[in-house]
Amino acid sequence: MEPYEAQKMMAEIRGSKETAAQPLPLYDTPYEPEDEGASPEGEGTPWPRESRLPEDDERPPEEYDQPWEWKKERISKAFAAQFEGSENCLSPGREEKGRLPPRLSAGNPKSAKPLGMEPSSPLGEWTDPALPLENQVWYHGAISRTDAENLLRLCKEASYLVRNSETSKNDFSLSLKSSQGFMHMKLSRTKEHKYVLGQNSPPFSSVPEIVHHYASRKLPIKGAEHMSLLYPVAIRTL
């Protein structure tokens, strides 16, 4: 063997022994940028390290080092608060569906609805049919047709009042505001001492019974078949 080849072989053997003597690292050494010099003031302080946190992350930096078990309780509380807020924000339709209708008592006639009421008819304000006509809030006595229209002018559609008839002292008039204007319907007294509304209504014992009946039913009057007596116009007392 030539001297050059023997020297090369000895160098390779020596290098392999040194490599085997050095233990391999378990983890890779993370990259750390070298200091690029002193600060602009020349005080020898290193440049501040750049933050590697995401720009849109609002969490404090120390949360990145917390294990999942530490943050799990905080996340659970956040979900619980959000769930409670959504339960408190119920929509009107959902809240109305959840309400139970009030139980009717035998001693409270105002809580009972009239039998035979049309389901599609809107409900007007309740009228006590046993109360005398003079004590009803919607009875205005001897006022003219013009005065009745002036009272109804600022009211909503289906507002009404009852007044004395200007042509017959034994009859009354029902003044009603419709979408087309004002309507004046006669409440006539029959020979049997009953009262009828117009020409197509059944007889009633009193005018308050008529108002109570048509507060939940359609009026039998041409041009007002779609309407009910919904909003009484109360008399003004001084």
UniProtKB/Swiss-Prot annotation:
It comes from the Eukaryota. SMART domains: SH2. This is SH2 domain-containing adapter protein F. The modification Phosphotyrosine is found at Y64. SUPFAM superfamilies: SH2 domain (SSF55550). The modification Phosphoserine is found at S39. Residues 55-66 have a biased composition (Acidic residues). Interacts with phosphorylated 'Tyr-720' of PDGFRA via its SH2 domain. It comes from Mus musculus. Residues 138-233 form the SH2 domain. One of its GO terms (biological process) is apoptotic process. Keywords: Apoptosis, Phosphoprotein, SH2 domain. PROSITE patterns: SH2. Residues 1-70, 85-121 are annotated as: Disordered. Adapter protein which may play a role in the regulation of apoptosis in response to PDGF. May become phosphorylated upon binding to PDGFRA.
